[in-house]
Amino acid sequence: AFPEAKRFFYEHREETKQLVDEVTALCIDYATKQIEHGIDAFQLFDTHAGLLPTDMYVEMFLPTICRITDAVRSRGIPLIFFRKGLGSGLKHITPDVCDFVSIDWQTSLKDARQMVHPKVGLQGNIDPHLLFAPQKEIAQTLESYKTFFQKHPNWIVNLGHGVLADTPLDN
């Protein structure tokens, strides 16, 4: 479980760094295989980023994320980076990190746009639970995003996380 992993990180920093380096190398290998098989874009998910203090994440994990993103982008593939729950840590997202950053539903698009470098596009932010609402309400909510898109055309409409397993297919 994550609490035990986080404790391990604090108790065994060097071992954690070694483990993260090994996982990073595997991620780069995986991304390279995806590129070799013809992907048009790559999305890197860091679903647990928000469980760590921002300073710790920036110091210990963002450099490894950048190794992965550099490997992908050096092959001419655009990269979308998803950091769930990081909130104010979005200010560390620059064009050197990614082309687009996915925003979870816990951070407003307006706040994200103010924090993230203007050359980095935004994706997401729609609460996956919205898809349980009546279709009329879904349409109204999506309509409310038009104003943001008109001011910030480098936004990709998307959920702020994955589709939930029991989401009605019609929605």
Region spans (language model):
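Active-site loop segments of alpha/beta catalytic cores
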Residues: 1-171
